[in-house]
Amino acid sequence: MQINSIKIPLIELQNIKVVFGAKTALQNINLSIYPNTVITIVGPNGGGKSTLLKVLLKLLSPTDGKVIHHRDLRIGYVPQKIHLEQSLPITVEKFLSLKKGISKAEIQDAIELLSIKHLIHSSMQKLSGGEMQRVLLARALLNKPNLLVLDEPMQGVDLSGQIELYQLIHQTREKLNCAILMVSHDLHIVMADTNEVVCINRHICCAGSPEKVSNDPTFIHLFGDQFSQNVAFYTHHHNHQHNMHGDVCCIGNKHSVQCINNGR
């Protein structure tokens, strides 16, 4: 059976509570992720974002509450970072081929979609932050996900590189018709087609559209008024395109950042 109704959640968290010893990491978390939606989770360091992600992926069992995965759920996961042994270099091509049950044609499709053909013989250890994220995203797509989970995908990537990654994520979502759950430490740039931002600080502090959350008193208390006034939206209508190092590399489908409240 295919998941084709927006009324059926891909994942549902019901009254989740996680306790480590005497410390409550999460409590009263209720969250549903529907097909073809984009959800961004933000929150302060130590607020439980990583714990929530582990529970959602069933890598950690909650102390209380229920995690429901739809039977047809296919997750593509992009971790915040991976550890690579420096003494054992591995090429991008070899790294992608490590995933079992994947054909060369499927790897080639992912390489072309993420525009990383020029990197296939490069050492993983020598990739820039933006290049690494492209490769990790390509690997996640090999699972043909209907839910793409991105853990801090913009970490270590400069502003222009972030815009380029958002472009790729948007294109990926359109091609695969998948939902996206993105975990971030801030709201400086969010996808323009984000349906909901969820702010976590051990519990759900506030949730809603990016504009609503950035002006919520609880969010401002956590992140500061100046931060809340500098939320920008990636949009996918452009007049030029950057590479991962921020250089303008071609004219065609492009990107821009529309800033909210600060006139940038």
From Swiss-Prot:
Broad enzyme group: translocase
Catalytic activity: Zn(2+)(out) + ATP(in) + H2O(in) = Zn(2+)(in) + ADP(in) + phosphate(in) + H(+)(in)
Subcellular location, principal: membrane
Membrane topology: Peripheral membrane protein
SUPFAM superfamilies xref list: P-loop containing nucleoside triphosphate hydrolases
Superkingdom of origin organism: Bacteria
Gene3D superfamilies reported for this sequence: P-loop containing nucleotide triphosphate hydrolases
Claim: Transport is one of the keywords in the record: yes
All copies of domain ABC transporter, residue ranges: 11-226
Family: Belongs to the ABC transporter superfamily. Zinc importer (TC 3.A.1.15.5) family.
Function: Part of the ABC transporter complex ZnuABC involved in zinc import. Responsible for energy coupling to the transport system.
Full protein name: Zinc import ATP-binding protein ZnuC
Gene field: znuC
